[in-house]
Amino acid sequence: MTNNKLLFKKDVNGPWSLPIIGGIYLINDNPNRALTKLSKKYGGIYKIWLGESFSMVVSDPEIVNEIWVKQHDNFINRPKNITHKMFSSNYRSLNFGDNPNWKFNRSMASSHFTKTKLLSSKVTSVVEKKLNKLIETMEYHSINKLPFDSYVGFSEYSLNIILNMLVSMDIDECENSTQNVIYSINEIFKMLSTNSPQYSFPYLKFFFKKDLNNFKFHLDKIKSFIHSIYLKQLESYDPSNPRNILDSFISDLQSNDIDILLQICIDIVVAGTDTVANLLQWFVLFCINYPEIQEKLYNEIIEVVGKDCKVLKYEHISKMPYLYGCFRESLRIRPVTPLSLPRVAKCDTYIKDDIFIPKGATIIQNIFGMGNDEKYISEPNKFKPERWVEYIKNKKVNKNGNENSVNKYFNDLDKISIPFGVGKRQCLSPAMAEQESLLSIATVVLNYKLKSNGQKKLNEKEVYSITIKPQPFKLFLEKRV
């Protein structure tokens, strides 16, 4: 492909490309913002060369649906690069695997994360038990007026829920320390990012040897951690009496392919831990920055459960529309995976009849751009949970709040805010992330006023890797009376 020439009769617009680097000169430390800025100039789908990778960036809801839902089979696979290959054991994982590996792995894993199973007494009791432990830890910090490390605390909370579902144990029962595992997960996500240099310049991997060695070091630590859990599980494994998800995986994989089994577990542990921890951090940050919203949320919670309740249960959550509005608004304005995971076109194709996508093109779904564009949502930079409360009310009477707009997607929030993706390859368990987050944040707000150590608002600009997290901040917990 010649970078600055019209490639095809129905070619889309895009920025000017420089030799070798393409359009990378336009990308900063926050690719989600840089790509969103470009969409305002070049439209809801545009082309950009990222080094030697020909990419197309999509932030138009209709085109997203066309590619990720209607033409799913043509865009099922991921683009290939060295870190994805290393992480996925040669593209055999849930997140980075190709068909047919991905399809088999997804089918096996998803059956354990249905909404029905997640609401079973076995799972809900695990979540409530870990939530009690989280509150105990917070209580210690509150009494002693110590800052609470929200990333580590929420990561440990989420990690223990996943491990209990997966192997019926806490991380404390494993040989690895909690902070080491969490740190390694964080380092892995940095290197999997679309703005890592080895993503755009794979032929220069020799020059990134130090980074790749660091990636391998942390990946090996996580693999060793999962493998040790697997060996411990085997000691008491009874095929006639599966105790947890890993037991079921062992039974399902008749071929005894240990590598695939371990890879699926790694995907679940790594993605599940980081996603929920970052989601909760953003929720807390917005509660701190908008104390009036935090108090309105608190009043809704005590109206449902009273002040004597200490830990909420799942049945309480459905009675709290404002809580749900805060959750969805947090995910709209700061979606945890702002550019999702890219896809690659298997064959030449047309979308919307006249937009040509060539075979081999990398397709980037700009979730951040879609949910933060004034073309699709009123006052996109404002944190307004009320918009979701009103939207859900209107949906019940078949309205979406955009009857007077020329744009059919304007303020149609479910269409323009898709934090977990769409289609067959969306997040494995949005329901799990939602349940964990709603229950934990409501319980935390019920027990504590969330504050920072200063009068200024916390910085709302994100730190980008494959997911986004807030700038480091200190969380102080003031006991409610």
Curated annotation (Swiss-Prot):
Heme binds at C427. The keyword Heme applies. SUPFAM superfamilies: Cytochrome P450 (SSF48264). Its EC number is 1.14.-.-. InterPro entries: Cyt_P450 (IPR001128), Cyt_P450_E_grp-I (IPR002401), Cyt_P450_sf (IPR036396). It holds the Pfam family p450. The keyword Heme applies. Keywords: Heme, Iron, Metal-binding, Monooxygenase, Oxidoreductase. Its cofactor is heme. GO terms for molecular function: heme binding; iron ion binding; monooxygenase activity; oxidoreductase activity, acting on paired donors, with incorporation or reduction of molecular oxygen. It comes from the Eukaryota. Belongs to the cytochrome P450 family. This is Putative cytochrome P450 520B1.
